[in-house]
UniProtKB/Swiss-Prot annotation:
Gene that this polypeptide is encoded by: topA
This protein's name: DNA topoisomerase 1
Site (described: Interaction with DNA): H33, R167, R168, D171, Y176, W183, R320, R504
Biological processes annotated in GO: DNA topological change
Binding locations of Mg(2+): E9, D110
GO molecular function: DNA binding; DNA topoisomerase type I (single strand cut, ATP-independent) activity; zinc ion binding
Keywords: DNA-binding, Isomerase, Magnesium, Metal-binding, Repeat, Topoisomerase, Zinc, Zinc-finger
Record region (Interaction with DNA): 191-196
Domain Toprim: 3-141
Amino acid sequence: MQKSLVIVESPAKAKTINQYLGSEYIVKSSIGHIRDLTKGKLYNKEKNKKFLNENFIEKTNENKILIKQMGIDPYQNWKFEYHILPGKEKIISELKYIANQVKHIYLATDLDREGEAIAWHLKEVIGGDSSKFSRVVFNEITQHSIQKAFKNVGHINMNRVHAQQARRFMDRIVGYMISPLLWKKIARGLSAGRVQSVAVRIIADRESIIKNFVPEEYWKLDVSLISQDKKKINMDVTHYNNKKFRPINENEVSFAVEKIQKSSCIVKNYEEKISYLKAPAPFITSTLQQSASLRLGFSVKKTMFLAQKLYEEGYITYMRTDSNYLSEYAIKKVRKYIKSNYGSNYLPKEPNIYSNEKHSQEAHEAIRPSDIKIKNIDSDHLNSSAKKLYELIWNQFLASQMKSVKYKSITVTVLADMFKLQKSERIVMFQGWNKVLIEEKNVFSQFPILQTGSQLFINKVTPSQKFTKPPPRFSEASLVRELEKKGIGRPSTYSAITSKIQDRGYVKIKKNKFYAEKMGEILTIRLKKSFSNLIDYNFTAHMEKKLDQVAENKVTWRYLLDDFFKKFSEQLEQAKKSPEEGGMELNNIVPTSLNCPICCKKMGIKTAITGVFLSCLGYNNTDNKKRCKKTINLITLNDFNKEQDNQKKISLQLIQKCDICNMYMDSYFINEKLKLHICANNPSCSGYKFEKGVFKSPIYLSKTIQCEKCYNNMKLKIGPFGKFFTCINKICKNTRKILPNGEISDPKLEPIPFPELLCKQSDAWFVLREGISGIFFAANTFPKSRETRSPFVEELVRFQHLLPEKIYYLSSAPVIDNYGNKTIVCFDKKKKTHYIASKKDGKFTGWSAVFIDQKWCVINK
């Protein structure tokens, strides 16, 4: 009997689907995308000038080169050129071979637009009769869904493919056509993105608000009252003379205290009412990312990686969705579960229905467990983090179909002369969905029952000084919420956005909060001026709606791209002009009064992708022999000063203001005796101030580090991933990281090759390396192969002649535990020491051994 071929994206997904299909199906994986637009290095006119004649570097020829590099031609009706991704040739050959042997091909890639595009690419590359191909779509990898999907096969939706393709082309145009301009005008290594630049703007705008914020003083009054039955009630003063009470200084609050203390306090109103809090909606991608960040501390990237694993293993529905829709089948199952396990009291008469958000795309289901009966996952294929995420999804889905929480809300209003005092509390009358989401349960103290007109007696009046606070910095969770609120990007892109803007060096995360880097601020200002549409919130959201219309066949993809490119190219040509002609401003160096310690010329303030630093003006000398390359690193105060949460302290800090434009100034350390304050508008504003004194500086500024390899000194440098020390010996090239706490990392081992130990996932072999989590084996072909694992002790014993003195003691550890299980090397991050543990069937046994006083001591749990 001739078989059929089923193609999916991932091996894990293929393995799970294979369990539900019969022997007449061959399930294979494409391992993601198989082809993409042609990609070449961006053309740099200045760099390539010497290789080209004058005619060749004319504008038209520059465009030809750029078009070839982009793989798309906006001037020729959006012609495009795709190429097979490196490493996918073998996969494609296998798929083509099998495709020729089977009677039918089912393209079972993911149900979103990206999955639709992958299905189309597979069909194009495999080729053959179109009638031989069918599109299969399912929301969850369960036997019920798979069988249902294969009974209702369809065809590739080219409208959705065009929507994905239009997005891809637009992003390629923006990235490839703006980046060379940014290199020329601002700094090398910069890039712009249709969505990423808007995300950077959100963070940079918030950064500006925070830095410009001036705390304002205000006071609150807390009045402790005693009822006639001797019970205490604490109330807030909310109004004075029917106006909101908000004293701004101590004199005003002292007047209020005196007045209230002399007044009679009479209960004006005591109100009780019943209120209900509806169950939260099941997760969509953005709310899952936010909840996982807030409740589990997961990054957006980690959340999506784990959700992908859960989906591929068949535990949850598809994880990229912006729809709250739940199928009748899922609702029926969960209602039955609630009734059986919690009783009819917790089950609403009708299912809870949640309307989709205004930005929702196709009617996918919300994220939910595939089987509500599976409360906890018992699988060796998934780690504890994946299991925690599943539990979060399970609880949210179950709670979404339970009854509302019932509250009794109590509000008390008291009059004291012209002052109004108020207090509101609520008591849980019925837990409802809080029975599942225990962490959201509200616990409140109860008021004494008060009669209207009854008198209360003043026990104490307590004034407290407060200061207004700036809006908080964005966390990953709140940034995703802001992107969703503004309609920027899609659920499937949030993870890539938050990762990319960090990788580019435009923002950084510190203590789970986003900070805009100086280059991110400069880039935002330049793009706002030269590409106002591109970086506008409404324009970006509008473009998402237009892409939706392409997917719905309401707008043609070429028309959308033509309309976008016409306006974009006009702005691009204007931005290329000189600043005097209205073009994009340059990232000019700002001269200072500080002399270069080498050539005595002046040092200037310069901003690059690595940060702000001082550079000798002698670097611009046309004579290379006379060019001075001296630079001085500037360390921001935020890098080692803890944030002051006490707003009173903030208000008393001396805020440096620019003498030229009155803008706030960023402060930097040069050394223990010199600070530099730079106008936040730099380089557009040349304002700066030096401050002399004796300052407490970071540990690494006052230390002289010696290279452990060649014994030369090491100097401080700043790279894309932070500060580090590098050996002054150019041949040595040794580096040492600076840890987040300001300490310098210990020297790491040189990689040790183990060609005898072969990898399982590729043809590579292992190399012993040392990282922040101790020693580990990694593939020698990294990053092509990212396979890693812990070393077995028996392997270290076998090759102990290769081990350096630092870890030689590990070869004397027990090779097996008391039960014959092999032991592996582990690392204790708190103690920063290695220890030995054993595993059985992929799980730790509880047996371990530590090295104390030159011997191994066994610990059994």
